[in-house]
A protein has these predicted regions:
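Short, exposed beta-strand/loop patches in secreted or surface proteins that constitute
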Residues: 50-54, 104-115, 174-183
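Generic recognition of long tandem-repeat/solenoid scaffolds
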Residues: 59-65, 72, 114-126, 186-195, ...
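Extended low-complexity, serine/threonine- and proline-enriched intrinsically disordered segments
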Residues: 71-100, 154-158
Length: 264
């Protein structure tokens, strides 16, 4: 009986926690987050359909053309589902160049709302389905950028300063058919000049110093391994010499089938 009560209580507690977790973060995004200032001005004048600038703090700024009155922002969870993309510093630019904040989007009958699966941005009154641009800031992970292709078209991703992707072990870009270039400040731009048809854009990059650290580790491992091999060979040579001095090692012909030495 006690076990049944404990099991029932545990199930109720799990249900309560699960229900609470599922409801966390749903609803309209707060005005403080929507209207916060981005770390740097958005790249409104880009000639790409989507332009992403990755910051050194792993956050990234995105500007993308709108081709629908509603945009769903999400991340794939690896289990066939999605999670809402957490956004801040939301801005919308009308085709005439007027820029409004996220709270102004809401005040003009639009919305920026988070559900359990995605963040929904509905364009404000007077915004055409295409021709405008949506900008927002979100968070990522160190040395890796992955984002679904929310809009069809060309893409450009700017890496943080001093980041590279040339070394195959540490650098990787997907999908292919891209090109890279460096701007006047030395930052690497990854460009898909042709419309991207893949579901996700993914870039793995590294700091320049990572190569030096990797090279140092390889050299250290090589030195330790070489030293260990040398020590092992020396010990074997010493053991062989001692056996010879003690008369244990006696060379015999391969064809000699007689008794061992000392028993003849």
């Amino acid at each position: 009986m006690n076990r049944r009560l404990l099991l029932a209580a545990g199930c109720l507690a799990l249900l309560a926690v699960t229900s609470g977790c599922l409801g966390i973060g749903t609803g309209p995004v707060s005005a403080d987050r929507l209207d916060s200032e981005p770390a740097a001005p958005y790249e409104w004048e880009t000639n790409r359909t989507a332009h992403v600038t990755i910051q050194e703090n792993t956050q990234f700024r995105t500007v993308m053309e709108t081709n629908s009155s509603t945009i769903e922002l999400y991340r794939r969870d690896g289990f066939g589902g999605t999670n809402p993309l957490s956004v801040q510093s939301v801005r919308y630019r009308y085709p005439n160049g007027t820029v409004i904040t996220g709270s102004e989007i809401q005040n003009r009958s639009g919305e920026v709302r988070q559900t359990r699966d995605e963040t929904i941005v509905a364009l404000p009154d007077g915004a055409p389905p295409s021709g405008g641009a949506l900008a927002f800031t979100s968070g990522g992970t160190p040395k890796r950028f992955t984002l679904p292709t929310y809009v069809e078209g060309t893409y450009e991703v700017v890496l943080p300063p001093d980041r590279r992707l040339d070394f195959p072990i540490f650098g990787q870009v997907s999908p292919g058919n891209y090109e890279t270039e460096r701007d006047a400040g030395g930052q690497v731009h990854v460009i898909w000049a042709e419309p991207v048809t893949a579901d996700t854009v993914s870039i793995r990059f590294y700091l320049q110093r990572d190569l030096y650290i990797f090279g140092g580790i390889v050299a250290l491992v090589g030195a330790v391994g070489g030293g260990g091999l040398f020590y092992y060979r020396r010990q074997i040579d010493r053991l062989r010499q001692r056996r010879l001095e003690m008369g244990i090692d006696v060379e015999i012909d391969d064809d000699d089938e007689g008794p061992p030495p000392g028993m003849r």
